[in-house]
């Protein structure tokens, strides 16, 4: 990645002065931060897994009557 695309704070701007994207969509998948939808999907799956574990535990083991 060239350093001339970076702004004063080190981040890459979304658009160049002529309006074209600064970074192609292919490179956005491999460089920089993770997409928010991916983080939310993994986090949601983790929450559902923990809740499922609690429900499973309520029907088996200690406290299952």
Swiss-Prot record:
Transmembrane segments: 36-56
A single GO cellular-component term on record: photosystem II reaction center
Domain of life: Bacteria
Record InterPro entries: PSII_PsbJ, PSII_PsbJ_sf
One BP term from GO: photosynthesis
Annotated compartments: Cellular thylakoid membrane
Complexes and interactors: PSII is composed of 1 copy each of membrane proteins PsbA, PsbB, PsbC, PsbD, PsbE, PsbF, PsbH, PsbI, PsbJ, PsbK, PsbL, PsbM, PsbT, PsbX, PsbY, Psb30/Ycf12, peripheral proteins PsbO, CyanoQ (PsbQ), PsbU, PsbV and a large number of cofactors. It forms dimeric complexes.
Family: Belongs to the PsbJ family.
Name of the protein in question: Photosystem II reaction center protein J
Organism: Prochlorococcus marinus (strain MIT 9303)
């Amino acid at each position: 990645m060239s350093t001339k695309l970076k702004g004063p704070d080190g981040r890459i701007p979304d658009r160049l002065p002529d309006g074209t994207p600064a970074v192609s969509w292919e490179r956005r998948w491999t460089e920089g931060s993770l997409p928010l939808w991916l983080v939310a999907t993994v986090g949601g799956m983790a929450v559902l897994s923990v809740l499922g574990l609690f429900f499973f535990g309520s029907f088996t083991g200690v406290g299952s009557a």
